[in-house]
Amino acid sequence: MRKTKIICTMGPSTDKDDVMEQLVREGMDVARFNFSHGPHDEQRGRIQKLRELRKKYDRPVAALLDTKGPEIRLGCFKDGKVSLEEGQIFTFTNKDIEGTNEHVSITYKELYKDVQPGGHILVDDGLVDLEVQDISGKDIVCKVINAGVIGDKKGVNVPGANLKMPFISKKDHEDLLFGIQEGFDFVAASFTRTADDIREVRKILKDNGGEEIQIIAKIENQQGVDNIDEIIEAADGIMIARGDMGVEIPPEYVPVIQQKIIQKVYTAGKPVITATQMLDSMISHPRPTRAEATDVANAIFQGTSATMLSGETAAGKYPVQALQMMSRIAEHMEENIEYNTIFKKTDRNENPDITNAIAHATCLTAIDLKAQAILAVTKSGSTAHMMSKHRPGCLIGACTSSERVLRQLNLSWGVYPMLIREEYSSEILCLRAIEAAQKHKLVKVGDTVVFAGGVPLGIPGRTNMIRVCIVD
């Protein structure tokens, strides 16, 4: 059974026929809804369909709302696009004008305050590079470094600039309220720069009844990388969004940044997602390149909790095949990981509390006894997250009475979430956990399982008991 979780992005391709249903059947763990595209009515139809499929297949597929975030875009051109030549002068202005091959408006009107001569402005994922020559009033005068064609509303990146633009736009605020109303499990906060950005999102969620929604910080610029420690502490998980990161930051730096962030988040006992262009060629082709397969495998080897498919499932020709391929790569990689070695290297001192100590002891017991599974009863999910951090090798059956926590646990590496009702006796609770594991075919008669729970029961953060049981 695959331990690495897979996120699939919803879009036009998943709207066709029974594609979303096939993705659920083939093991999609989290469905990502990209709110940079598609109105609320369109997204509402998709989340409703997902709810129906959860019920039909009894699978706790989580729903993730990915915000548009504080992005910068060009205005529109008179003819829809212009061709820029190397060496020519081109101006970005905060005036609302029709674009020509000499100038264009920009959505962030205060950008002229945040850039300096010598800095660079990149358009359309970095395909066109312009160097800032002068700030003339509120206009940014640039010289074209790389020639190319730019068109209406193309994205703009400003590497190295400390942008002061608001983190939550009016659209993002409306999308968050929509996410609360529709019962989303996660919010992915795009272009997270500081811990304050996460706190701002959390306040909106809490003030509007969405305090149970977990926040995934998307790291995709230098500010986010520089402030990664405080962001990890404030967020519930991290997404390494390598698309914009590879534009904002030199591409040769991205692999090392990815490795370091995965290690930091992994050590903190929180989920970490590696995203963007993982099987990008499968948008158009039925098989990935060897480099893409290696990229997925390398992220798993580094310790990622989940890998993500973006355009491959949202707009590609082979969405189901992309999920199947990513799943096969993950399963084969997991067969070749030395879990005992990883466990010995896990630093317990990063989180010196009762939950982490119990999680470590439970995993150690499971390794020593070669247990078939760990069964953890968890109210908030924190115990299962910590056990996932230790990579015990065996599956972690996480039992919870909360349907929201059930789905959120589906993002954690090696965790198989199961729904059980609350009990007020540790004996009965252990029995219910084993029954659930048997029902889901995690264990069979004669298997050794290690059970972890809390007394008194039902209180988050109170896991303090370990038991070894033989299934009978």
Question: Where is each model-derived feature located?
Answer:
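Non-catalytic helical/linker scaffolds that mediate oligomerization, partner binding
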Residues: M1-D472
